[in-house]
């Protein structure tokens, strides 16, 4: 792998020779494969997906696999039993459990596509919490909506808006997850296109865009509320420097979370702040920077869920919110796919037929399948391994 010269010079300098050598070695190795179990749909303690069962230590439901199975051909993936997610990004699970408290809260995941951090955070949030999962780019928002629908949890709303739209809507949240767009240095191992697109000019553009995004959304975080700021890049301009800029210019204090030495998380490379860096060759995952800030001010009140929904319905583009209304064709009522995916569906409404692997794959290919003659007539809910 040939890295851009400017990137190599800067990164070697900020990491130091020993860390940089380990980092380069990590980039030459195959990226680990990891998944996260959906605890709302399956028994997380007993389900087995793929080969190997090494736990991701900073995520309650995260697992490393010994290889990369053909996920596309696993009906359990399509039913939302698990989510294929890079292990470092699962650190949000640990952060939520450590800092978000034990009472139901309202959270905004600002730059959420494709949905890994949203669904991971929701698995860790106190029951009764609500999460708005937002993505401003329409095609990415549709992928996000598909993954949130598949996850099946209630109290998750998908929107297609820019941070300024939330600001205009005057919505206030207890916590905001800001996994901001970045120069993508943490994706070098997985995507050679990220190397080709990298430049010092792009780093500068990303740094400025990140500040704009956080500034636009800051009024939507209640006084005393928590912001999780993260990127998938390594340079300090987008990471430590921006985090310190948020604290100084917008008004916030840093929060430290406990970690274990064996997790091999690297602290801040510059400045005096608690930060959590996942570096290939050091920690088992891709590149990630994360830090946690608490907004200045006496602990304020976030909007109640009912008011958040009212504001969203009036001022935002909601593209998914629980079970969609059925389609009516003449005298026939056709349920929406979201009803089949939801854990809140009325299980007595439609009879259930559990199908085998061959039938499930045929269904996923949009092929007609034939059920047993004893199967109920009319609309039935198809499951695979009872999911």
Regions found by a protein language model. Name each.
Residues 139, 174-215, 228, 232-240:
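Mobile active-site "lid"/loop adjacent to the S-adenosyl-L-methionine
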Residues 103-113:
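Conserved class I S-adenosyl-L-methionine
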Residues 1-46, 284-289, 296-387:
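Polybasic, low-complexity RNA-engagement segments
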Residues 33-94:
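Conserved AdoMet
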Residues 107, 128-134:
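Short beta-strand element of Class I
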Residues 219-346:
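Substrate-binding/catalytic lobe of Class I Rossmann-like enzymes that use SAM or dcSAM, i.e.
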Residues 136-171, 178:
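S-adenosyl-L-methionine
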Residues 114-127:
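Conserved SAM-binding loop of SAM-dependent methyltransferases across substrates and taxa
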């Amino acid at each position: 792998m040939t890295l851009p010269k400017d990137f190599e010079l800067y990164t070697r300098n900020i990491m130091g020779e020993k860390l940089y050598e380990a980092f380069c070695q990590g980039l030459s190795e195959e990226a680990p494969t990891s998944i996260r179990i959906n605890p709302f749909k399956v028994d997380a303690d007993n389900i087995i997906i793929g080969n190997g069962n090494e736990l991701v230590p900073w995520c309650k439901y995260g697992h490393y696999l010994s290889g990369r199975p053909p996920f596309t051909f696993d009906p359990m993936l399509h039913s939302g039993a698990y989510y294929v997610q890079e292990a470092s990004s699962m650190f949000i699970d640990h952060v939520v459990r450590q800092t978000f408290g034990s009472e139901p809260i309202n959270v905004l995941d600002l730059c959420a596509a494709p949905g890994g951090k949203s669904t991971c955070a929701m698995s860790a949030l106190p029951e009764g919490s609500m999460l708005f999962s937002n993505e401003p780019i329409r095609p990415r928002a549709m992928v996000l909506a598909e993954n949130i629908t598949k996850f099946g949890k209630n109290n998750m709303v998908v929107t297609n808006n820019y941070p300024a739209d939330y600001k205009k809507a005057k919505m206030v949240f207890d916590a905001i997850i800001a996994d901001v767009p970045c120069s993508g240095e943490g994706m070098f191992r997985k995507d050679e296109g990220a190397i080709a697109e990298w430049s010092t000019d792009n780093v500068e553009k990303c740094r400025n865009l990140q500040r704009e995004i956080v500034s636009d959304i800051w009024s939507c975080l209640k006084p005393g509320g928590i912001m999780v700021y993260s990127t998938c890049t390594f340079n300090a301009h987008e990471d430590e420097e921006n985090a310190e800029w948020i604290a100084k210019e917008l008004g916030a204090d840093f929060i430290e979370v406990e970690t274990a030495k064996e997790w091999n998380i690297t602290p801040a490379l510059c400045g005096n702040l608690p930060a959590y860096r996942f570096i290939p060759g050091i920690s088992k995952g891709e590149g990630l920077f994360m830090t946690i800030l608490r907004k200045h001010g006496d602990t304020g009140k976030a909007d109640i869920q009912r008011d958040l929904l009212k504001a969203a319905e009036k001022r935002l583009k909601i593209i998914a919110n629980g079970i969609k209304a059925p389609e009516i064709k003449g005298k026939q009522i056709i349920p929406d796919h979201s009803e089949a995916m939801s854990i809140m569906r009325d299980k007595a409404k439609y009879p259930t037929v559990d199908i085998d692997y061959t039938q499930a794959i045929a269904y996923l290919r949009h092929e007609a399948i034939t059920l047993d003659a004893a199967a109920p007539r009319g609309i039935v809910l198809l499951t695979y391994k009872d999911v």
